[in-house]
Each structure stands twice: as structure tokens, then as C-alpha cells.
From Swiss-Prot:
It comes from Pseudomonas savastanoi pv. phaseolicola (strain 1448A / Race 6) (Pseudomonas syringae pv. phaseolicola (strain 1448A / Race 6)). NCBIfam families: PRK00295.1. Gene3D superfamilies: 1.20.5.300. The gene is slyX. Pfam families: SlyX (PF04102). Belongs to the SlyX family. InterPro entries: SlyX. This is Protein SlyX homolog. PANTHER family: PROTEIN SLYX. Signal peptide: none annotated.
Amino acid sequence: MSLEERVMELESRMAFQDDTIQALNDVLVKQRREFDHLQQQMAAMIKRQEEMGSQFDTFEEEAPPPHY
């Protein structure tokens, strides 16, 4: 294999690697957005659960009805 062929082969590999790196970066960016969205949803669910839990806590603290 001549030097020119080796250089062409390396340039070709480098071009494919650049494409692969860009594709991987695109996937990573998409996953990061999805992760951030899921974190926001999780925080909202935790807040809602805490609010619901505090509602149930108030029921337990109330005195029983007079017929008990």
C-alpha cells in the first residue's frame, strides 16, 4: 500500500468517525433533553405526592366522630 493510499484510507476513516461522533452527539443531546424532562415530571409527581400525603395526615389528626 502506497503512502497516498494510506493517507486516503486514513482520511476516509476520519470522515466516517466524524459522522459517527456527530450522530452520537445528537443522540446524547436528545437523551439529555428527555432526562431533563423526566426529572421535571418526577419533581412534579413528588410534590403532588407530598401534597396528597399532607391531606391524609390531616384526616388522621382529626378527632373521631361523636358516635364512637
